[in-house]
């Protein structure tokens, strides 16, 4: 697809690379209590264990799937029409919303009637909705009234990953099925740092966590296309992928491609951080084609409306922007309401000052007017807008540290306390909240961030950017931050915002997006393992079994990135025959540790002794052989 002005709605096409199923994978669905609750998963086919290793069946493995209909061969994908409105019936039957005649924001009306935008505009036939007068349509409001919504049931099924089904298929796989099931479901005890991880997620548990404020379901009533998901420390750790154009790079087509690419590899949510041309139109195309929640930073677009002059921002412009984006279907807003006038001087001695774009915008406004932030002063009015559309807060950390030097300083924690106070205000309105966190933090200082967030914000979900654990690796900050992300995820962070290799350097392309996502999927999964999340080790165990049995294709396919794993293997062992070889190019055929281990097991079986006895017996035989050959360390050839 081409960029900015040349993007044409009539010829828009889905990215072919995003729609093909992953190798040996198929889309499967689990139906809930009603036929329109169909929860998607990816099922990975496995080969049978080779006869020499026991010849047992290896049933398909179910994994979490964020790719939506794009990887379902039965789905008809046309990005000009958008995705099906999965939640429409659920929203309508609640009877607490009204259909509007059209956009009610001034800017939304302006864009809709601008003839110059016709060729690039998404042709949405469905008008927006909002809450009826006096109604509250948030998932938190329903949860606090004791209502288990279809979204909550959908999430419960999704979080359980069909573990019971997998257990049953293992048990039915053969005469040793029970033994195999016990082996593959084995998991080391975790350290959850106070998180309450039930053995199975129920719809009622989802409701309780949302009612308590410990979890959020980002699900704007104007984004019926999403497949519901949850963010909370008692659930699987999630990751977010940032996309978005700039004034000098990328356009609508590229950003839609990045979104479909991001969800293919595991992005649980996507933030559109566009700051260039056609922000409104870009966002519409992304939302209409996204099965995952979309977040934004509304102050970015508000700033564009005043030609980049922060001091000219007004509450009226910002309010109109909130309504504009809420009526498009944005699921969560990053709002930097904790950047207060008294906190700005606290950043004076920092090495890197205020590095958050949103934070710096509001700091400049506060200083220009020498007034308290209108985001802080008008926070209750913002809550009224949020609950009319069920937009969740992502309370921004505008004073986050931009270097390890500035980590855990007075400004950062003053803002965090304020975010905790604002959380209580939002909860008074039954508006869902998560809290954004740093940033750049050395490893030994990360745990304090989590502990203080839990204390000040009353266990509202934490959503962190990394944190980056060192500042010496431009070009590799997906790694410096992945280390911190794994740690803070273990300590209790609910969602990790990915960092790409281009962080601090430039706008990420599709490859950067994938690299960032895979890095953060690793971090999130490592955190789930460390917390002891039920069933977290199943995929690890299945892949380890495949590795030991030299099922190369299964190793590739069970991994997070089958394409890259296969590519690396094929660089040195490209032939199909090498896919059944009992070695890889690292050690070769004579030094493969797993092959040697298997040889020991075969020897033990042949001798009718234990592996331990086989090792001892084998060493004795080799000792005798050594003496018979003259007891020489080296022999002439």
UniProtKB/Swiss-Prot annotation:
GO terms for molecular function: 4 iron, 4 sulfur cluster binding; carbon-carbon lyase activity; zinc ion binding. [4Fe-4S] cluster binds at residues 584, 587, 592. It is an enzyme of class 4 (lyase). It catalyses: 5-amino-1-(5-phospho-beta-D-ribosyl)imidazole + S-adenosyl-L-methionine = 4-amino-2-methyl-5-(phosphooxymethyl)pyrimidine + CO + 5'-deoxyadenosine + formate + L-methionine + 3 H(+). Binds 1 [4Fe-4S] cluster per subunit. The cluster is coordinated with 3 cysteines and an exchangeable S-adenosyl-L-methionine. It comes from the Bacteria. InterPro entries: ThiC (IPR037509), ThiC-associated_dom (IPR025747), ThiC/Bza_core_dom (IPR038521), ThiC/BzaA/B (IPR002817). Catalyzes the synthesis of the hydroxymethylpyrimidine phosphate (HMP-P) moiety of thiamine from aminoimidazole ribotide (AIR) in a radical S-adenosyl-L-methionine (SAM)-dependent reaction. Belongs to the ThiC family. Homodimer. This is Phosphomethylpyrimidine synthase.
């Amino acid at each position: 697809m081409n960029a900015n002005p040349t993007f044409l709605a009539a010829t828009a096409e889905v990215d072919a690379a995003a729609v093909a199923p992953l190798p040996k994978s198929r889309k499967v669905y689990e139906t809930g209590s009603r036929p329109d609750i169909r929860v998607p998963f990816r099922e990975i086919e496995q080969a049978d264990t080779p006869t020499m290793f026991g010849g047992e069946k290896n049933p398909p493995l179910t994994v979490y799937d964020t790719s939506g209909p794009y990887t379902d061969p039965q789905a008809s994908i046309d990005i000009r029409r958008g995705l099906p409105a999965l939640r429409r019936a659920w929203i309508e039957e609640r009877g607490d919303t009204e259909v509007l005649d059209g956009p009610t924001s001034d800017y939304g009306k302006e864009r809709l009637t601008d003839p110059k935008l016709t060729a690039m505009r998404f042709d949405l036939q469905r008008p927006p909705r909002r809450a009826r007068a006096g109604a509250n349509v948030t998932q938190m409001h329903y949860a606090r009234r004791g209502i288990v919504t279809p979204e909550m049931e959908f999430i419960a099924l999704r979080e359980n990953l069909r573990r019971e089904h997998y257990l049953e298929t293992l048990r039915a796989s053969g005469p040793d099925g029970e033994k195999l099931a016990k082996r593959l479901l084995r998991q080391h005890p975790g350290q959850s740092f106070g998180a309450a991880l039930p053995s199975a997620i129920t719809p009622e548990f989802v409701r309780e966590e949302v009612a308590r404020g410990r979890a959020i379901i980002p699900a704007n009533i104007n984004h019926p296309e999403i497949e519901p998901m949850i963010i909370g420390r008692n659930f699987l750790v999630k990751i977010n992928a940032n996309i978005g154009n700039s004034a000098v790079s990328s356009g609508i087509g590229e950003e839609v491609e990045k979104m479909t690419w991001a969800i293919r590899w595991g992005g649980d949510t996507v933030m559109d951080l566009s700051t260039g041309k056609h922000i409104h139109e870009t966002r519409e195309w992304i939302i209409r084609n996204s099965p995952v929640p979309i977040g934004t930073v509304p102050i970015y677009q508000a700033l564009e409306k005043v030609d980049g002059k922060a001091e000219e921002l007004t509450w009226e412009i910002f309010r109109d922007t909130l309504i504009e984006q809420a009526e498009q279907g944005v699921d969560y807003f990053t709002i930097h309401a904790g950047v207060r006038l008294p906190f700005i001087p606290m950043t004076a001695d920092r090495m890197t000052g205020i590095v958050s774009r949103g934070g710096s915008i509001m700091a400049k406004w506060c200083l220009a007017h020498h007034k308290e932030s209108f985001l802080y002063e008008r926070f209750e009015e913002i809550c009224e807008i949020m609950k009319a559309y069920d937009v969740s807060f992502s309370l921004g950390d505008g004073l986050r540290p931009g270097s390890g030097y500035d980590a855990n300083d007075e400004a950062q924690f003053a803002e965090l306390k304020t975010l905790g106070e604002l959380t209580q205000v939002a909860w008074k309105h039954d508006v869902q909240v998560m809290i954004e966190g740093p940033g750049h933090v050395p490893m030994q200082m990360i745990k304090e961030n989590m502990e203080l967030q839990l204390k000040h914000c009353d266990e509202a979900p934490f959503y962190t950017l990394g944190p980056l654990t060192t500042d010496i690796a431009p070009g590799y900050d997906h790694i410096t931050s992945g280390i911190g992300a794994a740690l803070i995820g273990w300590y209790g962070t609910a969602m990790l915002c990915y960092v790409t290799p281009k962080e601090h350097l430039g706008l990420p392309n599709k490859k950067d997006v994938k690299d960032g996502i895979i890095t953060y999927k690793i971090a999130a999964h490592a955190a789930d393992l460390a917390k002891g999340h039920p069933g977290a080790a199943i995929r690890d165990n299945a892949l380890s079994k495949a590795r030991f049995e030299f099922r190369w294709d299964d190793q590739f396919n069970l991994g997070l990135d089958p394409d890259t794993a296969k590519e690396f293997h094929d660089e040195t062992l490209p032939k199909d025959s090498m896919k059944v070889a009992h070695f890889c190019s690292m050690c070769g055929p004579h030094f493969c540790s797993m092959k040697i281990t298997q040889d020991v097991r075969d020897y033990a079986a042949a001798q009718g002794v234990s592996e331990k006895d086989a090792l001892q017996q084998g060493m004795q035989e080799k000792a005798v052989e050594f003496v018979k050959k003259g007891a020489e360390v080296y022999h002439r050839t």
